[in-house]
Amino acid sequence: LEAEGVIGGGDLARMKEEAEALVAEEARAVIEAPWPEPHRAGENVLAKEPRRIRIEPLEPSTRGQAAANLPPVETGPPFDAKGKTFLEAVTMGVADALSADPRVFVFGEDVGGKYGNAFLLLRPLLAQCADRIINSPLAEGAVLGVCVGAALAGQRPIGEMQFNDFVATGFNQLVNNAAKIRYRWGESVPMVVRMPWGGLRHAGPYHSQNTEAWFYRTPGLKIVVPSTPYDARALLASAVADPDPVLYYEHIALYRDPRVKQVLAAEAPAPIRIGKAALRRRGSALAIVSYGAYVHVAMRVAGKLAKDGIEAAVLDLRSLAPLDRDALLALALQCGRVLIVHEDTRTGSVGESLAAIIQEEAFEYLDAPVRIVGSLDTPVPYSPPLEEAFLPSEEEVEKAARLLLAY
């Protein structure tokens, strides 16, 4: 730098001396500062949340306290063959965000140019928003790192993983940077990561995984999993407005499913609070808890049971983190039998965590063991007959429900 005339003689030594003095001053301030009060260990993980504490479910004051918190039935707009697909709803949600806030931009692989992402989801937006739908290198760590930096700089990035499987190469940016920055030094990281996910499409082990459990146990990340077009659009609005990093899981098998279409208004919907489950069907004989594409499997099974005079409730979690524990426990207390259904493999899954919560906090109200139906503990097979054997079928879910009812 001296040879090029960028800095003068002695500048380097002076800058080094100034830097060392600054570090020494800050280090001295930290050393002299008092230790924080122990109760602060549970603070500042997410914005606007109560201090996190350990729950002791055996305390008399906490047992059965969620019994009165059963949410109302929330079906959303009826399914309509003339309505919008799940994919179109996500497109509308991105359009809502881009039009409402100039700080919003989309960043990901093949999202811009003339392509509009691997599913052409963003193509309708390119004509008006080409300068804010930006192609990234083929590097998921770079996508997520740019989003973290942009969020810290005051922007509202919507990052895209072309398939949620690919997030593995950007793991550090999510779990060690985005998730921990608020807890470490109090800064907000308002970013959304769109995560196309799931099987049911014969796409093999690198384009079909369920990665939500990877992040479910990471404090500092929020996770939403809409199951309907209406919720997809409304939850995306909530995610973009949120001050914390949000993983937005959109199930690929729902994208163009003709059975899952809803008429959506031209104007943006009211946001849905992240962390609020939806009771899709009321019942008292059995509670079926699910999220994502398998909510629709749960609804079909509940419909079959109803033909035999058995009324099963269906709870659509919508958010995994934060989790609507009150709705989950209230339904367990009301029904006494709980069937958890998801596409993910069983071991270490969200379902196992839900079962543990119910067993610990509602044990006295249960009439049967909590049952979990998930995929086999294998990678996702590519071959159609193998994938069909890997995934939990509607028939398996119905069988599990009837066995639970007969217990």
Identify the meaning behind each predicted range.
Residues 1-37, 43, 49, 53-249, 253-254, ...:
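Thiamine diphosphate
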